[in-house]
Amino acid sequence: NKRINAMAEDGDPFAKLIVETDTFGSRVRVRGAETGLYICMNKKGKLIAKSNGKGKDCVFTEIELENNYTALQNAKYEGWYM
């Protein structure tokens, strides 16, 4: 497992993400295009990266908010968001 560092630097090649659908509906997995690692959540609510994204800790449910933004709620730890 690797730590995730989000520095918000424009043009950073590690900022490109690939969103994969998990099932019919609004469940997705997110992985880094450069690394191939999946964004997951640990039991403390911290974002971590894993090479295998098959666990529920790596699945997120898309929730559309009133302001038209999309929130990603972790499938394993409901109430925790990315």
UniProtKB/Swiss-Prot annotation:
According to its UniProt entry, one GO biological process term is:
neurogenesis
Q: What InterPro entries does the record point to?
A: Fibroblast_GF_fam, IL1/FGF
This chain's protein is named Fibroblast growth factor 8
State the family it belongs to. Belongs to the heparin-binding growth factors family.
The function of this protein is: Plays an important role in the regulation of embryonic development, cell proliferation, cell differentiation and cell migration. Required for normal brain, eye, ear and limb development during embryogenesis. Required for normal development of the gonadotropin-releasing hormone (GnRH) neuronal system. Plays a role in neurite outgrowth in hippocampal cells.
The record's subcellular location field reads: Secreted
Taken from the record, one Pfam family name reads FGF
Please give the GO cellular component terms listed in this UniProt entry: cytoplasm; extracellular space
* Entry-listed glycosylation sites: 68
The UniProt subunit note reads as follows: Monomer. Homodimer. Interacts with FGFR1, FGFR2, FGFR3 and FGFR4. Affinity between fibroblast growth factors (FGFs) and their receptors is increased by heparan sulfate glycosaminoglycans that function as coreceptors.
Q: Say yes or no: keyword Cytoplasm present.
A: no
* UniProt organism field: Canis lupus familiaris (Dog)
Which SUPFAM superfamilies does the protein's record reference?
A: Cytokine
**According to the lineage, what is the superkingdom?**
Eukaryota
Q: Which keywords does this Swiss-Prot/TrEMBL entry list?
A: Developmental protein, Differentiation, Glycoprotein, Growth factor, Mitogen, Secreted
